[in-house]
Amino acid sequence: CRLVVSDLDSVLKAAESSGDAAASVVSDLKAQSFDVIDIACDVSDETSVAEAIKAVMAHYGRLDIVINNAAIGDIIKPLPELSADEWHRVLSVNLTGAFLMTREAAAVMGEGSSVINVASQAAKTGFRQMAPYVASKHGMIGLTRTSAIDLAPSGIRVNAVCPNHVTTTMGKAQSEYFSSLRGLDPETYRAQIAERVPLGRVGRPEDTASAVAFLASDEASFITGEALNVSGGEETH
C-alpha cells in the first residue's frame, strides 16, 4: 500500500488556513486516483463529530479505520501561570475529541475495524511546562486501554502510538519554545534531541505514519490495547 502523510498545520489555525491545506491535499490525492473527501470537524464538539461520521457513511457506506490525531500542543507555560480555560481547551481537543470520535465511530464500525490514537512520548513521561498536553496524552493511553476492552466484543481494535519529538509544525513550534528557554537556536536544540535518541535522529512524520499503518492493517489483527513507542529507542516503557 502507499503511505500518505500530510501536515495540515496547527489546530489553532483550522478556521484560517487548514481548510485550504486540506483542499490542496484532497486535490493531490484525487490526482493519484484516491477516492477522498475533506470534512471540517471540531472534534471537541459532539454535534460536529456526529456530522463528520454521517458524512463519511454517506460517501463511503462504511468506516474501517479511525485515526485520532487532532491536538493542541503549543500552550506551554509553568503550571502556576496556566488558566483553567487553557487547561480545558487542550483537554477538550486532545482527549475529549478522541473519546467523542471513538464513541461515534464505534457505532458504525464493524468486525476487523481499527482505531488508532496518536498519543506521544508525553503519554508516558512528564515534561516541564506542558501540564495540559502531558495530562491529555496520559489520558489517551487510559482511553485506549479501556476502549480496547469495551470494543473487543464488536471486533474493533484500539491502539495508540507514542512518538517522541517529530518534525511537524507543532514539533517545530515546541522546538522554538524550548530552545529559547535554553538560549539555543532551534537547529542546535534539535541536534541535542537527536543525540539523546539511541538511533541518532529526530522522528519524522513518516515514522509515525508507518506505525499507524501497521496497527490499522490485518498484520496487527491480534494487537489491541497497546501503546507503541515510536521514538528511536528514547522511550522504552
Model-derived segments and spans:
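Substrate-binding pocket helix/loop in short-chain dehydrogenase/reductase
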Residues: K77-L79, E86-H88, I193
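Short-chain dehydrogenase/reductase
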Residues: C1-Y60, D74-I75, D85, E176-Y177
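Residue(s) in the substrate-gating loop at a strand-loop-helix junction
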Residues: S120
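Active-site loop immediately N-terminal to the catalytic Tyr-X3-Lys motif
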Residues: L79-P80, G112, T125-A131, P153-S154, ...
